[in-house]
């Protein structure tokens, strides 16, 4: 007797660009208990307004990055010179025309997410990340502060549906305190910390695990907000003539391991035990292998290490960390290794790799993997705990 094929997570045919998709949650039962609030732990939002030029003081307007709409995408950079080029701009054109993709139509955003079965979201930036390493550190901080004000306004307009991710000064302690204090006063609950920190004001590469950076971590720890890291900073090491966008997506998670190692082997978590860290959009299947490899590295190189980790490798994960995923059946099969309280479902709206348009299938897969009661935590409870919100 032949067995029937396993149901697929993906709709039949080509899924297509997000701007051409629509939600179908009302037509499908996920198996979640009635009344479950689905909270996507990782979505993205484009800035539609020319916020930096509008909000910079007159004497600095000539240094403000501009934002404009062109050929289906919101671009930014000096006037007419987009910093968003190549595959990055091509990808933006896949979704920026969605009614709710940008900050100028929060009502449409809430509606599109609801049609896809999503009640609430944590919204990360899109093209603004191209400004992460603006060469003028003072202008960079001003950019971040303007963005924080803007995303806080979006959060307010969403009436509890959208929680914005802020940006902070990570290169000096006073700036970290300044931006964290302001970010908290705006009602933001977390911030994005780049995995590649770039250079300090003197042009020296920043080492997150250095003694000099400890004062910045002190400020982050004192603020009490969780740290988020996101894929997307790793670039292919050599060009691809064919399907470069797919190759780039496959290496996106590369930098997680380096930062993960800094937290453990670099002593960051030993010196700052109050930190909480989330890893976003990289899935969860990477976690067991990273833990296993870290245990082997520690056993093999302990005699050479200047800093001796104070705890078992897995305790750092269990105490401080969690991760988000969209479609990760392999990771869900390893849930006992990872921890049911350490994983957070997301739709990643409105990206190409998002489940937007078929999120009900992904949610049902979570229920099938862990059961309805545990699924409630995975699809909403864990991200609310991470952010420290109860509503």
Task: State where each predicted segment sits.
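Alpha-helical scaffold segments that form or flank carboxylate-/histidine-based iron centers
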Residues: 33-41, 138, 168-171, 175, ...
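Short glycine-enriched loops at secondary-structure junctions
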Residues: 126-127, 170, 231-236, 349-352
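Catalytic pocket-lining loop regions of alpha/beta-barrel enzymes
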Residues: 3-8, 161-162, 168, 178-337, ...
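Mid-to-C-terminal alpha-helical segments outside catalytic/metal-binding sites
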Residues: 2-37, 50-120, 149-157, 178-181, ...
């Amino acid at each position: 007797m032949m067995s029937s094929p396993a149901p697929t997570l993906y709709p039949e045919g080509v899924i297509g660009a997000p701007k051409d998709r629509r939600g179908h949650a009302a037509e499908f039962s996920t198996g979640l208990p009635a009344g479950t609030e689905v909270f996507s732990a990782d979505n993205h939002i484009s800035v539609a307004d020319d916020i930096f030029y509008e909000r910079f003081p007159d004497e600095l307007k000539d240094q403000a990055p501009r934002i404009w709409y062109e050929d289906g995408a919101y671009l930014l950079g000096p006037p007419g010179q987009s910093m968003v080029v190549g595959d990055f701009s091509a990808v933006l054109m896949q979704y920026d025309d969605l009614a709710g993709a940008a900050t100028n139509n929060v009502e449409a955003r809430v509606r599109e997410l609801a049609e896809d079965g999503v009640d609430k979201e944590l919204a990360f930036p899109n093209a603004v990340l191209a400004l992460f390493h603006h060469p003028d550190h003072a202008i960079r901080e001003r950019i971040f502060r303007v963005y924080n004000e803007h995303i806080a306004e979006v959060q307010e307009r969403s009436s509890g549906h959208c929680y914005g991710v802020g940006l902070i000064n990570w290169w000096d302690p006073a700036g970290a305190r300044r931006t964290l204090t302001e970010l908290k006063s705006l009602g933001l609950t977390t911030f994005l910390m780049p995995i590649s920190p770039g250079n300090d004001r003197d042009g020296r590469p920043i080492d997150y695990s250095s003694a000099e950076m400890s004062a910045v971590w002190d400020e982050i720890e004192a603020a009490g907000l969780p740290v988020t890291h996101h894929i997307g900073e790793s670039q292919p090491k050599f060009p691809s003539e064919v399907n470069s966008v797919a190759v780039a997506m496959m290496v996106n998670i590369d930098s997680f391991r380096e930062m993960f190692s800094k937290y453990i082997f670099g002593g960051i978590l030993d010196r700052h035990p109050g930190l909480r860290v989330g890893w976003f959009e990289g899935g969860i299947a990477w976690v067991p292998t990273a833990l296993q490899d870290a245990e082997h590295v520690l056993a093999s190189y302990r005699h050479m290490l200047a800093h001796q980790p104070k705890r078992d490798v897995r305790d750092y994960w269990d105490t401080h960390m969690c991760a988000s995923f969209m479609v990760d059946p392999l990771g869900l099969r390893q849930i006992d290794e990872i921890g049911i309280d350490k994983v957070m479902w997301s739709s990643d709206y409105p990206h190409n790799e998002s489940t937007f348009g078929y999120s009900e299938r992904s949610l049902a897969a979570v229920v099938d993997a862990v059961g309805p009661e545990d699924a409630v935590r995975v699809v909403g409870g864990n991200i609310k705990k991470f952010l420290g919100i109860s509503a």
